[in-house]
């Protein structure tokens, strides 16, 4: 739903239900549910982006469709005149009407562009006066920023991929070092406009490619669904073929291509260096899934409602076919192929991409003495939010990219940032992961009934768990006063073990990571999840 129609009986909605590929504007009768289509993209290319209303007439004054750049279709001639007046004064900027006085005589207007993170204005409708109120990031020198342009290229199967390319300002745009920056999601998209990372990398001398690979949103159901079950396959081809296109155009130097991204972009980074190991000369993977099976097993409780969507788009781990697909599409399965210099960045408290996703790939590389740089911030989650952590990561990443791709980097950093960088830098040889643990000692036998004791809030709680072990793997069932649960993905390496306790507590399913070590008749370790934090435990046999 968008808002009520002025008759207060119908509701404006956006929908692509049925045979419609694109999201359209429609009206739904609140009583009968009958839907009447109002408008879809006149060019038939993208989903509905936004609908603007007059708060006086309650009528639609404009609709917007975000193609390569936004396209605006006016329904009110006076509003169109105001828009064009501002557009003619400010040039190639995107204009957004934020709010107005009750009589709509004065407007707060914001503008953005590829070289302007944002400026806010006061527009007087009667006088036509346009007054600057403030700039976002006012200390940023706009004159040194690099322009972003729209490109399109064909992927491996001929599908056209929309993308954005930022070329360093002042360069001739030829034979440049390139950094591919895939977006996260992956069910999201990049837009034309100001991009912090694109500008930072361009400032350091790199061309920056931001592809909207299949599976990205905004381009209709067919384009979105074309990414179903294509992680690491055609979705990755869409990125690879973008690199090839820029090399063929003479823009990118094939010997100086890097890839950097976070979340799904981090997955694409790891996929790039495992599935196309000869393509990249440097890679920075930020909060990156390395194992699709363990990624889905660690879905946080507040995502439980969309688990079925993940299974549809990524494969169902509860079927043999789904498990094989996930193994095939997981970069961890091919870690031995990696020959690209790699930096891995992780937040220790990430509820979406668990730390073990990074630990697994780092441990796999360390086990064969392959050099990898690893940063772990203990006070971060899915991405870095604290300025000192972000600055430390950027300082490390730009030095790393410069070393392998030849761009510039700032050698100096504040003592605070330098200290923090030292604190979050992890020696890969100290990283342990159940999937890559090289401990060859016989697996301790965990089979049987156990009493786990945890202390939470000053009170002791007992959990009874019965474990069934088969070689180096185990499953189990739990029971406590709080609820029941099942043990899944249990792994034993020597005396060390990890597992997921999928607990049913007060009608909610919570995945809790269980890590520890065991003797014949005792265990100790930790339960951890975003919902409960970190809770140490001890355990003994329940005889």
Explain the meaning of each model-derived region.
Residues 171-176, 181-220, 354:
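Short substrate-entry loop that stabilizes the transition state in hydrolases
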Residues 442-543:
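Central antiparallel beta-sheet cores of small beta-barrel/beta-sandwich binding domains
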Residues 56-57, 62-66, 72-92, 99, ...:
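Extracellular/periplasmic ectodomains of large secreted or surface enzymes and adhesion receptors
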């Amino acid at each position: 739903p968008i808002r009520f129609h002025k008759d207060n009986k119908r509701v404006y909605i956006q929908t692509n239900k049925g045979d419609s590929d694109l999201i359209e504007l429609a009206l739904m009768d609140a009583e009968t549910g009958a839907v009447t289509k109002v408008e879809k993209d006149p060019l038939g290319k993208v989903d509905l982006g936004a609908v603007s209303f007059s708060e006086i007439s309650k009528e639609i004054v404009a609709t917007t469709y975000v193609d390569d750049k936004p396209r605006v279709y006016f329904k009110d001639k006076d509003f169109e005149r105001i828009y064009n007046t501002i557009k003619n004064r400010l040039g190639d900027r995107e204009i957004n009407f934020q709010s107005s006085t009750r009589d709509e005589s004065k407007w707060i207007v914001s503008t953005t562009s590829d070289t302007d993170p944002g400026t806010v204005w006061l527009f007087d409708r009667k006088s036509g006066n346009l007054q600057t109120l403030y700039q976002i990031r006012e200390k940023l020198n706009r004159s040194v920023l690099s322009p972003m342009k729209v490109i399109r290229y064909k992927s491996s199967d001929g599908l056209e991929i929309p993308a954005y390319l930022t070329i360093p300002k002042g360069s001739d745009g030829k034979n440049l070092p390139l950094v591919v920056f895939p977006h996260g999601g992956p069910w999201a998209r990049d837009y034309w406009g100001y991009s912090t990372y694109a500008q930072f990398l361009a400032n350091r001398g790199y061309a920056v490619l931001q592809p909207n690979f299949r599976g990205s949103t905004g381009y209709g159901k067919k384009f979105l669904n074309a990414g179903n079950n294509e992680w690491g396959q055609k979705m990755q081809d869409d990125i690879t073929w973008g690199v090839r296109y820029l090399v063929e155009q003479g823009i990118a130097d094939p010997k100086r291509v890097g890839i950097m991204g976070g979340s799904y972009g981090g997955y694409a980074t790891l996929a790039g260096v495992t599935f196309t190991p000869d393509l990249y000369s440097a890679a920075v993977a930020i909060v990156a899934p390395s194992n699709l099976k363990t990624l889905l097993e660690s879905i946080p409780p507040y995502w439980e409602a969309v688990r079925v969507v993940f299974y549809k788009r990524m494969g169902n781990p509860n079927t043999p076919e789904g498990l094989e697909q996930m193994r095939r599409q997981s970069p961890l399965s091919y870690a031995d192929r990696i020959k690209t210099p790699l930096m891995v960045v992780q937040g220790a408290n990430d509820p979406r991409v668990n730390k073990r996703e990074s630990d697994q790939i780092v441990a796999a590389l360390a086990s064969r003495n392959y050099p990898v740089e690893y940063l772990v911030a203990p006070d971060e989650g899915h991405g870095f939010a604290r300025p000192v952590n972000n600055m430390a990561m950027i300082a490390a990443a730009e030095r790393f990219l410069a070393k392998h791709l030849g761009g510039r980097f700032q050698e100096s950093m504040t003592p605070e940032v330098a200290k923090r960088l030292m604190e979050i830098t992890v020696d890969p040889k100290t990283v342990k992961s159940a999937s890559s643990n090289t401990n060859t000692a016989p697996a301790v036998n965990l089979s049987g009934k156990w009493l786990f004791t945890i202390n939470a809030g000053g009170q002791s709680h007992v959990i009874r768990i019965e474990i069934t072990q088969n070689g180096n793997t185990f499953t189990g069932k739990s029971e406590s006063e709080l609820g029941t649960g099942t043990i899944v993905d249990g792994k034993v390496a020597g005396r060390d073990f990890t597992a997921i306790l999928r607990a049913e507590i007060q009608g909610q399913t919570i995945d809790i990571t269980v890590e520890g070590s065991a003797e014949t008749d005792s265990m100790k370790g930790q339960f951890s999840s975003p919902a409960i934090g970190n809770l140490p435990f001890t355990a003994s046999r329940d005889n």
